[in-house]
């Protein structure tokens, strides 16, 4: 059973429960972690970001993606408000689709050291070509159920 949640005043380092400025860059963004109260159990956590945006590093035009982040936590969980702020920091960041997707996966893995993590970046077409990017760490723990990401590949009209 989980312990009584801490009040925000007891967790001054966390962004949760208090007003914080929006980070302007991914490097400036703080990704918080919290202890996993079920660390002795293998299970899956999924974050879905269907409106992720970044900028093309060449044209400065916006790029849009549907991100799916799945992970089997170890001792730590990603705190969701900090993840939201981290992902939002890409709105003014210029990088190619592959770089954004893999960098996000690596940053989360570095911060929380999950037993397993995968990220799927389903990017909307630019120049007529959709790009889907996938990255994962190691092997999935035995017995953990991972549903399909459920994001259809891009299909044009017709």
UniProtKB/Swiss-Prot annotation:
InterPro entries: GTP-CH-I_C/QueF, NADPH_dep_7-cyano-7-deazaG_red, QueF, QueF_type1. It catalyses: 7-aminomethyl-7-carbaguanine + 2 NADP(+) = 7-cyano-7-deazaguanine + 2 NADPH + 3 H(+). The keyword NAD does not apply. Residues 1-35 are annotated as: Disordered. SUPFAM superfamilies: Tetrahydrobiopterin biosynthesis enzymes-like. GO terms for biological process: queuosine biosynthetic process; tRNA modification. Its main location: cytoplasm. The active site is at 56 (thioimide intermediate), 63 (proton donor). It is found in: Cytoplasm. GO terms for cellular component: cytoplasm. Substrate binds at residues 78-80, 97-98. Keywords: Cytoplasm, NADP, Oxidoreductase, Queuosine biosynthesis. It holds the Pfam family QueF. One of its GO terms (molecular function) is preQ1 synthase activity. Pathway: tRNA modification; tRNA-queuosine biosynthesis. Its EC number is 1.7.1.13. It comes from the Bacteria. Belongs to the GTP cyclohydrolase I family. QueF type 1 subfamily. Catalyzes the NADPH-dependent reduction of 7-cyano-7-deazaguanine (preQ0) to 7-aminomethyl-7-deazaguanine (preQ1). This is NADPH-dependent 7-cyano-7-deazaguanine reductase. It comes from Rhodopseudomonas palustris (strain BisB18).
